[in-house]
Structure formats: C-alpha cells, structure tokens
Amino acid sequence: MFSCKQHLSLGACVFCLGLLASTPFIWCFVFANLLSLEIFSPWQTHVYRLGFPTACLMAVLWTLVPAKHAVRAVTPAIMLNIASALIFFSLRVYSTSTWVSAPCLFLANLPLLCLWPRLAIEIVYICPAIHQRFFELGLLLACTIFALSVVSRALEVSAVFMSPFFIFLALGSGSLAGARRNQIYTSGLERRRSIFCARGDHSVASLKETLHKCPWDLLAISALTVLVVCVMIVLHVHAEVFFGLSRYLPLFLCGAMASGGLYLGHSSIIACVMATLCTLTSVVVYFLHETLGPLGKTVLFISIFVYYFSGVAALSAAMRYKLKKFVNGPLVHLRVVYMCCFVFTFCEYLLVTFIKS
C-alpha cells in the first residue's frame, strides 16, 4: 500500500508531465496562427502548418532512441527550448521583420521539444490508471489554454501570453525526476522486470511479439483511421467543413488524440459503436449541411473526431493491458497514437492547402 502523500505527489508530477508533453504541439500552434499569412509569406505558412505532422513523426522517432541516451538529452534540450522561446519572445516584442529568423528558430527547436512526449509517456503509462488521467488532463488543459489565447486574440495583442509555455517547460522538466523517484512508479517498473534476464533488465516487447499480442487492436485502429480520413475528404469537398476550422483543428487533433477519451466496457464493442456513430453523423452532415447551418455542421463534424478518439482510446487501453508486462508498452502506445495524429494532421494540411472545396 502507498500513502496518500505518495499518490498526491505522483499525481502532481504526472499532471505537469502532461503540460510538458503538450509543448511541441503548442509551439506549432503558436507559429501557425501568429506568423502564417499565405498572401505575404506563403513558404513560411507551409513550414508552420507542416509542423504538426512533423512533430508527430519526430515524437515517434524519439522512441527509437535508447532510454539512457534520451535521459541524457534532458538538460541540453530544456536549455535550448527555453533559449529558443526567449528569442521568439524577443522577436515578437522588438523586431518587425521575422520572415527568415522565425522559421529557422521554429525548425531548430521543434525536434528537441518532441523529446518530451516520449519521456513523459514512458513514465506515465507505467503508473496506475488514475495517474494516467491526471497526465491526460494536464495535456488537454495546456492545449485548451493556448487555443483560448488565440480565439481571444490575446497572443496577437501581447507576447506576454507566451508565458504559460515557459511555465509548462519548467514544471514538466522538473517533474521528470520526481516521478521517477516515486515508489508507485518504481514498483510498476519492478513488475516489468524479467525473471530470465540479468539484474536491472526489464522485459521488452519486440515488433513480432506486439503484432502477435495485439493484431486485432491494430487492425481496428487502422480501419477506424481510414474511415475517418475518407469522411474528412468527402465532407471537405461536399460540405466545406473546414471553413473557419483550419486555424484550430490541427491542435485539436493532436491534443485530443494524445489525451484519448472515455472508454468503458469491452474495447471491440466500443470501437464498433464509435465507428457506427462516425458513419451516421457523417451521413447527416453530408445530406443536411445546408439545413444545419455553419454552427450545427461544425459541431457534428467535430463530434465525428470525438467518437473516433473514444474508439481509439478503448483499443489503445486494451493494447496497453496486453503489453503490461513489458517496459516498452507505453512506447508502443505512443507510436500507434502519434502515427494516427500524423495521418490526420497531414491529411488536414493537404485538404485545406491543395484541395479547394
């Protein structure tokens, strides 16, 4: 049994890790909304909007780096992240011409920011389920704060509203060590120790073993993803569903996808129900988009993604349970979820940029 103090301490740490894991998406969101203007800076706009799928891919690539090397990168990464954010802050306040310096700064800092989701998820999904919800709450809250800052035009008025970004970096990086030292986390790590390996080693799931244990879950996630991508294409061409959403949807796709949703009951049943709801809602939008009006159409279109997120959350939770004896189970979860993020954000970029409704 663990004390209440240990649970509260770990809950606070993983909440801060959720704030930290949101930073690459917030970085992309801020640049895409503040510095993107297709008329005056076309190539910069493409760089910033492609930042979302790039961040997802880089987060996946960081999972291929051995854990000991990833941990060693923490100190230089946080120093460069804060330095880059300070330079961006200074450019916003004191410089009137950022058409070259800002894209270079954006591209230099993004790969290092993508380290944080890997380190955070590697810790969080070894902890009990209640602490995983605190992590997801932190990530969702961070994305919501910056989305509201853009909606209210606070970021356009003053660069001071970038300050939460610095707070997220400071709190999150400081919480990494605290979470690792917590006995709840270390006991979860101990349960993944292999009895057939030398002292200090843990069981690791290979690609073959992952495919053997979770074939239907991966197939169902792929089928759901293909279904929703087809829905996006059809509704974009026929119903102009992205009108007014292109500024905010990429952050929603990244944030909500990484946060998951509610999953109750059997994963396959939840996935089937959510796929059915996605299909029915898309049919309603397709045939009644003129009757629904802009607000009704937007609400129903967003609800399609909420259903999808809930279905994938149920399937990914089932995958984590099947891989609970392996220390890299959380990284498998990250790869699957962030590849789904990549597919959606890249598809949204292609549709909005090249396929006019």
Curated annotation (Swiss-Prot):
<comment type="similarity">
    <text>Belongs to the herpesviridae BMRF2 family.</text>
</comment>
<keyword id="KW-1161">Viral attachment to host cell</keyword>
<feature type="topological domain" description="Virion surface">
    <location>
        <begin position="122"/>
        <end position="133"/>
    </location>
</feature>
<feature type="topological domain" description="Virion surface">
    <location>
        <begin position="155"/>
        <end position="158"/>
    </location>
</feature>
<keyword id="KW-0945">Host-virus interaction</keyword>
<keyword id="KW-0946">Virion</keyword>
<dbReference type="GO" id="GO:0055036">
    <property type="term" value="C:virion membrane"/>
</dbReference>
<dbReference type="InterPro" id="IPR006727">
    <property type="entry name" value="Herpes_BMRF2"/>
</dbReference>
<feature type="topological domain" description="Virion surface">
    <location>
        <begin position="289"/>
        <end position="298"/>
    </location>
</feature>
<comment type="subunit">
    <text>Interacts with BDLF2. Interacts with host beta1 integrin family.</text>
</comment>
<feature type="topological domain" description="Virion surface">
    <location>
        <begin position="320"/>
        <end position="335"/>
    </location>
</feature>
<feature type="transmembrane region">
    <location>
        <begin position="268"/>
        <end position="288"/>
    </location>
</feature>
<feature type="topological domain" description="Virion surface">
    <location>
        <begin position="239"/>
        <end position="240"/>
    </location>
</feature>
<feature type="transmembrane region">
    <location>
        <begin position="12"/>
        <end position="32"/>
    </location>
</feature>
<feature type="topological domain" description="Virion surface">
    <location>
        <begin position="33"/>
        <end position="46"/>
    </location>
</feature>
<keyword id="KW-1160">Virus entry into host cell</keyword>
<feature type="transmembrane region">
    <location>
        <begin position="134"/>
        <end position="154"/>
    </location>
</feature>
<feature type="topological domain" description="Virion surface">
    <location>
        <begin position="1"/>
        <end position="11"/>
    </location>
</feature>
<feature type="topological domain" description="Virion surface">
    <location>
        <position position="357"/>
    </location>
</feature>
<dbReference type="GO" id="GO:0016020">
    <property type="term" value="C:membrane"/>
</dbReference>
<feature type="topological domain" description="Virion surface">
    <location>
        <begin position="92"/>
        <end position="98"/>
    </location>
</feature>
<keyword id="KW-0812">Transmembrane</keyword>
<keyword id="KW-0325">Glycoprotein</keyword>
<feature type="transmembrane region">
    <location>
        <begin position="336"/>
        <end position="356"/>
    </location>
</feature>
<feature type="transmembrane region">
    <location>
        <begin position="218"/>
        <end position="238"/>
    </location>
</feature>
<keyword id="KW-1032">Host cell membrane</keyword>
<dbReference type="GO" id="GO:0020002">
    <property type="term" value="C:host cell plasma membrane"/>
</dbReference>
<keyword id="KW-0472">Membrane</keyword>
<feature type="transmembrane region">
    <location>
        <begin position="299"/>
        <end position="319"/>
    </location>
</feature>
<feature type="transmembrane region">
    <location>
        <begin position="159"/>
        <end position="179"/>
    </location>
</feature>
<protein>
    <recommendedName>
        <fullName>Protein BMRF2</fullName>
    </recommendedName>
</protein>
<feature type="short sequence motif" description="Integrin binding site">
    <location>
        <begin position="199"/>
        <end position="201"/>
    </location>
</feature>
<keyword id="KW-1043">Host membrane</keyword>
<dbReference type="GO" id="GO:0046718">
    <property type="term" value="P:symbiont entry into host cell"/>
</dbReference>
<feature type="transmembrane region">
    <location>
        <begin position="71"/>
        <end position="91"/>
    </location>
</feature>
<dbReference type="GO" id="GO:0019062">
    <property type="term" value="P:virion attachment to host cell"/>
</dbReference>
<dbReference type="Pfam" id="PF04633">
    <property type="entry name" value="Herpes_BMRF2"/>
</dbReference>
<feature type="topological domain" description="Virion surface">
    <location>
        <begin position="68"/>
        <end position="70"/>
    </location>
</feature>
<comment type="function">
    <text>Facilitates virus attachment to oral epithelial cells by binding to host beta1 integrin family. Participates in rearrangement of cellular actin to increase intercellular contacts by binding BDLF2 and thereby promote virus cell-to-cell spreading.</text>
</comment>
<feature type="transmembrane region">
    <location>
        <begin position="99"/>
        <end position="121"/>
    </location>
</feature>
<feature type="transmembrane region">
    <location>
        <begin position="241"/>
        <end position="261"/>
    </location>
</feature>
<feature type="transmembrane region">
    <location>
        <begin position="47"/>
        <end position="67"/>
    </location>
</feature>
